[in-house]
Amino acid sequence: MSTSRVQSDLSLETFARGLPKAELHVHLEGCLSPDLMFMLARRNGIALPWNDAQALAAQYRFQDLQSFLDLYFQGCKVLVTAQDFYDLTRQYLARAHADRVVRAEMFIGPQSFVAQGVPIEALMEGVLAAMADATAQDGISAGLLVSVHRHRSQEDALRTLDSVAPWADRIAGIGMGGAERPNPPSRFTDFFRAARAQGYKLSLIHI
């Protein structure tokens, strides 16, 4: 590769890095770094199946969606307190700000956490506090999207919708995540109708 080509590529990268950006689809649980996962595991007395963060980082080479989801849900187990959700959200928003993201819209799926005994208040209050601090300190605009899991039941999705009602005015939209097969969004028509009836916008849904 010629010197001029290398310089051109570097100039383009520098230009791209400096541009203001919007990140409109990111799942907070999937942003959990190996170092933070281990820190939260220690804080909450949770054993992980890896010896250290370096061994965990080696697993971040995914063969398919399911291999990603397996690690994704393993990470969910270390998020227990409002402080945990605050730290996760604040770390992500700091990284986004460093990358010149000026607007970030973040999904979080309460069902995994509620199923393991985490109060919905801990999740929502931790995430929203971090969003407010990031806006005040860094000037980044952040929106929260609540996601339900397609591998769970529609009834559970409707319960989740009810559980986040106290924060409805701070939720930018409702979406859906998880393994697409064999879980088509058509199983959740009543859920989507209910979300629309309550005034929520519907965000991007994996098809």
Language model region names:
Residues 206-207:
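Conserved small/polar residues in nucleotide/adenosyl-binding loops
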